[in-house]
Every structure is written in C-alpha cells, then in structure tokens.
Amino acid sequence: MSQFDEKNKHIDVMGIRKILPHRYPFALLDKIVDWSIEDRTIVAHKNVTINEDFFNGHFPEFPVMPGVLIVEAMAQATAILGELMAETLFAHVVAKAGGGRRTFMLAGIDKVRVKRPVVPGDVLVIESRMVKQKNIICTAESVAKVDGQIVCSAELMAAYKDY
C-alpha cells in the first residue's frame, strides 16, 4: 500500500475502495482520519444515516444499527490497517504472493460487547490497534465510539488471504 503516505493521515472513501474489496451495501466506512504503522493503530469514521438499508427492518419504529454491522465496520477498519502495514508486517507473505490479490478476512471475534444503540445521525468513530501477529493471522483490539462514549468493543482476528 505504498501509494498511501503516512504523512497524510486522511484516506477518503475513494482511497478506501482502493484498499478494500467491499462494495455497497457492505462498504461501511466513510473515511480514515488517522493511522500509524509504528503505533499499529487506525481511526475510521462511519456516518450513520436513516438511508441505510438495514434501518428498513431493524427497527422501522426505532431504527438501530445492528451490532453485527458495527463489528463489521470495526473489522473493515482493522483490515485497512493490516493492508497499510502489509509491506512491513507481512513482507514474507507479500513476497510469496506473486502479485496476486490478497486481503484481510475476518477469522475470529472475541470479547464483543455492545454497550448502547447506534442510531441515525450518529458518527461512529472506530479505533483499532494490532496487538499480535503470527504468520498470516493478526489480532486487534477495537472499539467503536459515538460522542466519545464506547458503544461497542471487540477483539478481532483476521487472516491475510488470497481472493
């Protein structure tokens, strides 16, 4: 991911599309506002609007973002961090890939806690930090916040795989 410069910490939605294979309706992040290879951290934003398809059924009279989609947004932020770190963290895997397309795929979810509802108008701020890496598997601690309060936390595992 050498096309992204660590001096410019912002990545817009078009940059995200260059990193992740996700597309509508599963492209859940709007922008990256900060990231660091050295600190192994990333901060991403998701603007939650009433126009989200999932609000049609979850729940029409009290629209709440499903917890599993909050976790998916956290996983996407973590995958972007992994992609940005791939040339250093996974240099041995990248070297063997032979130019093939690889991405981080969710491999495990532990210690999930959903602490409060996320509703239309909220800005979901996702913070992830890589805490462990072994071969092609990495583990991250991730939290999602609204107005500075934690709404969800999880430990995520991802595998760097061909697709």
Swiss-Prot record:
It is an enzyme of class 4 (lyase). This is 3-hydroxyacyl-[acyl-carrier-protein] dehydratase FabZ. The gene is fabZ. GO terms for molecular function: (3R)-hydroxyacyl-[acyl-carrier-protein] dehydratase activity. It catalyses: a (3R)-hydroxyacyl-[ACP] = a (2E)-enoyl-[ACP] + H2O. It comes from Francisella philomiragia subsp. philomiragia (strain ATCC 25017 / CCUG 19701 / FSC 153 / O#319-036). Keywords: Cytoplasm, Lipid A biosynthesis, Lipid biosynthesis, Lipid metabolism, Lyase. GO terms for biological process: fatty acid biosynthetic process; lipid A biosynthetic process. GO terms for cellular component: cytoplasm; membrane. Involved in unsaturated fatty acids biosynthesis. Catalyzes the dehydration of short chain beta-hydroxyacyl-ACPs and long chain saturated and unsaturated beta-hydroxyacyl-ACPs. Its EC number is 4.2.1.59. Belongs to the thioester dehydratase family. FabZ subfamily. The active site is at residue 58. It is found in: Cytoplasm. Signal peptide: none annotated.
